[in-house]
Amino acid sequence: AVRAGDPTEVDLNPTFDLFQQDELNAMKKLNYDLLDKYWKTAVTQQHSVNLSGATEQASYFANIAYFTQDGNLGKLDYERWNFRAGVDLKITKSLKASLQVSGDYGKKNALLLKVQNTSSERDYMMLLSHPQYIPEQVGGKYIAAYGISNSELNATQCYNYELLQNTSDYTRNMTQNTYINAALDYNFGWSRILKGLNLRLAYSKAISTTKSNEMGTSFNLYKLVERTGSGQHLYTPVGDEAYYNEVILADSNFAQAHGGAISNGTDGGYINRQMTRSDNYQLNFTANYARDFGKHSVSALFSIEKTESEYENVYALGVNPYEFSNGQSNSLNSQIAGDATTSSSFGRSESGTLSYVGRVNYSYDDKYLLEFLIRSDASTKFAPENYWGYFPSVSGGWGVSKENWFAD
């Protein structure tokens, strides 16, 4: 009524641009609340087993856990395994060893919902904003959510959730991580000469792998050429049901929406795979010495650290899969675009660092302090002629408050 009375609405057709009274009355009985239809309670499960123990010479622990969860909407499930184990050994009075191993494996399966390259995270918003007078199917055919104009104003109107739930399209992600930490410690406390010297050798390694697969196909939606109601805005019977069954549901009254096939992702459908792997380790050797000789205190440290890392990734894309495709690489329809149906890329990188650290500290009666420090670092991130950098330093201190005359 407001628009009809607005003199600036010169192109307004009150019959077809506005809902009519018979349509408004019919809509009171319509409630295609898709969010309520598809929303479900998500179930989460978590199970774990723990083991631990100790003797005079060793202590140990182990844990394995399993977690699974499904989603509130659609086909979604996630599962993850975690494990941890460790042992500490007292090999001799002076020698100790430790080892810890941990890791996880996760897998997520979900329905691909990238209609016309929209975000796959928009399913909630699409269901929430779906007009509640528009059904998902009419006469056994999936319908585009065209509103009052019966035309496509936005690609999101091609989002038919029921159809998507019945496709084989998917997105799958897998992650796998393994971590190892080991160490040896030796104490020279038994030696009169080397007392105060401690050696430590530590090693850590991390391996991570990810893999993601996606498959999207194309599908067809329909629109009604002639709709129901005096303004032709509805999809359900208004008045004469015989007319609805004979005319509205006739095959000739259905036209393809969007002007052609609708893609779930890339035009024509696609198969996408990506894999990454990273492998790195760190090795440390440290020698610490600290000892007092009367009023003289001496401490020293020497350390070597070496790291190496490697990373690689592979990406592949294939378009125009067959309708019966199950995501395998041999299920592309090469008759459509020939050799242009596939593309791939890959990358690989390596890096490493090496560091030496030396430090000597001397203190007399906690009054006079002296420190010598030198550090040398090398990194493959720099040009070969600039691999190494050297950083020496000398510092001294005077504890004035320790002087006898200061207290007086």
Segments (PLM) and residue ranges:
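Transmembrane beta-barrel strand/turn architecture of Gram-negative outer membrane proteins
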Residues: 1, 55-141, 169-225, 229, ...
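Residues embedded in well-ordered regular secondary structure
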Residues: 1-75, 112-115, 344
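Extracellular low-complexity Ser/Thr/Asn/Gly-rich intrinsically disordered segments
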Residues: 4-8, 15, 192, 266-268, ...
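Surface-exposed loop/turn segments flanking beta-strands in extracellular/periplasmic regions
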Residues: 7-28, 118-158, 218-263, 310-343
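Extracytoplasmic loops and strand-loop junctions of Gram-negative outer membrane beta-barrel proteins
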Residues: 30-35, 67-70, 160-169, 264-272, ...
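Short acidic-aromatic active-site loops that bind/stabilize oxyanions
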Residues: 36-41, 167-174, 270-277, 343-351, ...
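Signature of Gram-negative outer-membrane beta-barrel scaffolds
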Residues: 209, 329-393
